């Protein structure tokens, strides 16, 4: 085999390995990108609320879905609320384990319209951690959030009057290494 053929094989192997590494890293990198930019309706997390209150009132609709593998009931206590940008709100979802076994779930979330994701900030949420319910247990799950007042000055979002906060609960599957 010539040196040129060997170099071509090495180059192809390097390209394939690079592509595999990129595929492996793409999900966490995309997740980080979405959290930083608010892209795709990804909500930001915050530890402190805004001190400035906005002028407009925005209606927040709450949605709850469950993957068919999770034997729970899951729903918001209220279907919607209103909030002024900068005002912190606390709302609750309810969950119930419908089985006689311990079951763990993990919630994923987003907001629509997607363009407001970067302005929707969660202070506290059940979605940050795995939730485990004992047999037939009912529980209340809090969500504390606020809308960044800058939503009013952004030409892309200044006309938004309705935001939907949506959760989907999935059965938590333990992974072994």
From Swiss-Prot:
The chain crosses the membrane at residues 9-29. GO terms for biological process: respiratory chain complex IV assembly. Residues 1-8 are cytoplasmic. GO terms for molecular function: copper ion binding. It is found in: Cell inner membrane. It holds the Pfam family CtaG_Cox11. One of its GO terms (cellular component) is plasma membrane. Residues 30-177 are periplasmic. It is a single-pass type II membrane protein. Keywords: Cell inner membrane, Cell membrane, Copper, Membrane, Signal-anchor, Transmembrane, Transmembrane helix. Belongs to the COX11/CtaG family. Exerts its effect at some terminal stage of cytochrome c oxidase synthesis, probably by being involved in the insertion of the copper B into subunit I. PANTHER family: CYTOCHROME C OXIDASE ASSEMBLY PROTEIN COX11, MITOCHONDRIAL-RELATED, CYTOCHROME C OXIDASE ASSEMBLY PROTEIN COX11-RELATED. NCBIfam families: PRK05089.1 (NF003465). This is Cytochrome c oxidase assembly protein CtaG. It comes from Ehrlichia ruminantium (strain Gardel). The lineage of its organism: Bacteria, Pseudomonadati, Pseudomonadota, Alphaproteobacteria, Rickettsiales. The gene is ctaG.
